[in-house]
Amino acid sequence: MQRKDALKEIARLRDELNRHNYRYYVLAQPEISDYAFDQELERLIALEKAFPDLVTPDSPSQRVGGEITKEFPTVTHRQPMRSLSNTYSLEEVEEFYARVLKLLPEEAGENPEFVAELKFDGVAVSLLYRDGFLVQGATRGNGVEGDDITPNIRTIGSVPLQLRGGAAMAAEQYGGREIEVRGEVFMRKDDFAALNEGRPEEEQFANPRNATAGTLKLQDSAEVARRKMMFVAYYLTDPQCRSMQHVQRLQRLEEMGFYTGGHYSTCRSFDEIRDFIGRWEVDRLTLQYDIDGIVLKLNNPAFWDELGATSKSPRWAIAYKYPAEQAETVLNDVVFQVGRLGTITPVAELEAVRLAGTTVKRSTLHNFDEIRRLDVRIGDRVVIEKSGEIIPKVIRVVPGTRREDSSEIAIPSHCPVCGTALLHPENEVSWYCPNSQSCPAQVKARILHFASRNAMDIKSLGESLVEQLVHNGLVADSGDLYRLTADEVSHLDRMADKSAMNLLKAIEKSRTREYERVLYALGIRHVGLATARELAAAYHSIDLLASAALEELSCVADIGPVIAQSVHDFFRNPDALALVEKLRTAGLRLAASAPKALVNRNFEGMKVIFTGTLERHSRDDAAALVAQRGGKEVKSLSRKTDLVVAGKDPGSKLQKALKLGVRVIGEEEFEAMLF
């Protein structure tokens, strides 16, 4: 075939395949069989193979996958991907509705519209289009940063590689614009069942959401393509759509080629909202995919900024979640787990029962006070409950069903793993194993924490591998990870040479993690990532922190007496100091890096407090803006405070600031100071 003929045929095949994709995924009106579609696709692939210079990123052939991604790079979202506040109570939905009406200005009218949508039980992602072409797909991650999984996103048939309009029209319609589309990736029930059926010798996925989450993080995009997933769009950011109502944006998404689910409705009263929720509580069972609730949004985006957002969620939307599913079963036994800090947690062993699409055999009992409160015994018939992806919990004993041979759950006197006598600190609920350095369960849990995403982020280091490393005496603490060799690791179960090298590369990369993450990774009791940041800001090296007196630590912003005591005790423990020295030898960052270049110096040296609610920024975002300009957010107000930024509904700090003579500004003036 001549090149000009190939070009013409390739263009025809692409247009046809894109049209069939749209009819199948968006309109649910397929015109041809899967076999006929595959035949057309194979012809396109063959032509592109013969003329490789004609391959384009938006070609349907690029959905087949085949790219191997060794590591997903991290990307920063243009706007934070906040989750919605959620409730299981219709009363709280009504309170939300009334609260929004009260906060809206008069021009919103007496009965502003809300949009009710189905809440898909999937994995949130963000898609970025430039000039009409898909250039990036990213996971939500922590809301600020996510993983770039573009090769895997490209394999999803309901994700347009090019926004509808054709190549010629794309430049005209979308040229010079960046468009962001957010939504959920999910798996249909029949596709999920087929996936599990094709894994007879492998562990079965618990539910479609777990299967979707796991599939999106696979490194082989060809395998991702084989697992059928869908994308439902629910949010559009487009410079040309700013004046559109939310429901109009959903319709615009459909015009662009996206699947939106279609089951959304505008509501002008709470009665209409309640009817929608009630109708779908029943009708959702007929769908071919899982939904776990209803999302309610104010229809007019012009008022979204007016209502603002908390640090976690917008005030103009809420998610109503259908009540948690429950099931009855028998509590056969109780086992005791040991956490990284030695906490003993009772876990119920249950007679297997189906709940929320999964088979449940275990459930948490939290602690021994909870066991007493429930008055639960071994042999009892109990009710368990599961909300979303939360671990199932025992919520009550079924009245009148207790057997004569039921037995009380005894508090163990010794650690179930290492046999050390347990301790029960005064004024604490939990019991602890004090054998922190030699108890295998604690050692393994600490290493897993050290390797976790927010700590050292050592990919490939999972529970089974840590189990082997500890059991075989290769590691006794987190510092030993940096002494592992390829020969040692490759001899472990399911660890070929390639897997061993991948692990060692991940460990090597972790040496560059920031000082604050190393502090968090140490696993100091009561020290989360936010506290680790405060400590790193106050003490620029671990040596300064280790030598700090208890009184000094107590004066650090947001570090109370309990945390101060915990940090102080940690650095007076010889085993902890030995671990720090191992990490120093391994080359980890035990001191703060040189500060990043400032955007400007408008807040240089200033201690700033925020009170009330800011409309344009979350509290964390505002604090970051101040830090980028040389200032620092503080929590405690005193005469040494330089500035108080007062948002809506400020607290008592405003009055205190006025009494102390501290400068107070509003959000508008704060915005002006940024530039």
Swiss-Prot record:
EC id: 6.5.1.2
Give residue ranges for domain BRCT.
Answer: 598-675
What would be an example GO MF term here?
metal ion binding
Entry binding sites for NAD(+): 34-38, 83-84, 117, 140, 184, 297, 321
Q: Which reaction does it catalyse?
A: NAD(+) + (deoxyribonucleotide)n-3'-hydroxyl + 5'-phospho-(deoxyribonucleotide)m = (deoxyribonucleotide)n+m + AMP + beta-nicotinamide D-nucleotide
NCBIfam families (UniProt xref): dnlj, PRK07956.1
Please give the name of this protein.
DNA ligase
